[in-house]
Amino acid sequence: MQNELAQTIPELINWTKEREFSLSLSSDRLAFLLAISIYNNEQTDGELLESDLIDLFRYVSEVFDQSEATLTQRANNAINDLVKQRFLNRFSSEFTEGLAIYRITPLGVGVADYYVRQREFSTLRLSIQLSIVADEIQRASSAAEEGGDERFWRNNVFAPLKYSVAEIFDSIDLSQRMMDENQHQIRERIAELLSQNWHEAILSCEQLLDETSGNLRELQDTLNAAGDKLQAQLLRIQSCLIGRDDLDFVDQLIVNLQNKLDRIISWGQQAIDLWIGYDRHVHKFIRTAIDMDKNRVFGQRLRQSIQDYFKCALVTLYCEAESLLDLRDDETMLNEAEAVGELPSELEYESLSDVQEQIISVMQAHLAPFRAEGKPIDLGAVLREQLALYPQSRHFDVARIIVDQAVKLGMASLDSQAVYPEWQAINDKGAEVQANVIDQYNK
């Protein structure tokens, strides 16, 4: 029996050769085709006049900053080019006195549909598509259980599965491939942001990572919820084919649909796993950049403090200018005088390394019981508790040390599930932290 599922490679090659396709679309030509497609969708009869096409080309020409003087000539060249490449069909008659009517071809519809509709991939659209698939497969399985001759199977089982279910599966698969491209674009945007000014780009990177992770998780949940039911219905139909050698074409179609469904579902999970790995890589890069760029962070905080200096409600009152000059003499006398007595502890010098070692030892002693007793570490609560014991000038170093010591002990199980925690305040100066509870400790 002739394979009714798809054409063979030689058939497709001969078909292409007979039609002599030669496709080449520059950016302005593609924009012109998309404009024609969108305008055509708004027309009731689907027919376009040459004046309509010239008006559409005028919009494209303005966007691409092309000369107005040669507009008509370039519009005619663009129209003839689309007709030659079979994106448009031209119809003319001796009764229309040279006026032509244009209709967009299936090839033009397909190319425009790829660039316009397939980018609208959302959970709502996916849910509607899966709902339609479920209804079609349900009707097909009910018809299969009724039984009948080959013609009955062809009309009531094979036709809806091939021309409805299979096409929707192909549409979902194509949309997933568009999301692959979208992920690559997001990665390029994140790389560009981090290469310019990573400190200012952290918030934008977090937003892009969160949005993409949430979209992938939501779409995968929708696929998982419907996948098992669809596979069960396909198995129902397949069980009705036992002993029916005349229905091999239906059995082959069922196998193809099962493979497509498995590929769609597995793609979603694989995309999530890959994105989680990329997410961790970006966060690791940011943490490393912070550790390597302490001087820059300090410099930025210093510049910020200078910029905010005049916002403080401080007023200096000057009076008796001569007395102020006299103070200089007193200062000179004090500088020349010999210092006696003990220096207050607040003014004693402590090296930064000694201070950090003290804080590290204290934090290790504080966090060790959590690991020993298997208790989860809530970084937000620990940071709030410890920062309250230190002056504000040490909050940055203390917070960094606490996070470093906690990460060495273990990790949060929610991180592997792409679950992002809420921001928590850790002091009364507006500092916040975003961290899941650490509940898996290293051995």
Curated annotation (Swiss-Prot):
- The entry's keywords: Calcium, Cell cycle, Cell division, Chromosome partition, Cytoplasm, DNA condensation
Its Gene Ontology biological processes?
cell division; chromosome condensation; chromosome segregation; DNA replication
Return the protein name: Chromosome partition protein MukF
Q: Where in the cell is it found?
A: Cytoplasm, Nucleoid
Its function?
Answer: Involved in chromosome condensation, segregation and cell cycle progression. May participate in facilitating chromosome segregation by condensation DNA from both sides of a centrally located replisome during cell division. Not required for mini-F plasmid partitioning. Probably acts via its interaction with MukB and MukE. Overexpression results in anucleate cells. It has a calcium binding activity.
Protein family according to the UniProt entry: Belongs to the MukF family.
| InterPro entries for the chain | Chromosome_partition_MukF, MukF_C, MukF_C_sf, MukF_M, MukF_M_sp, MukF_WHTH, WH-like_DNA-bd_sf, WH_DNA-bd_sf
Q: Does the keyword ATP-binding apply?
A: no
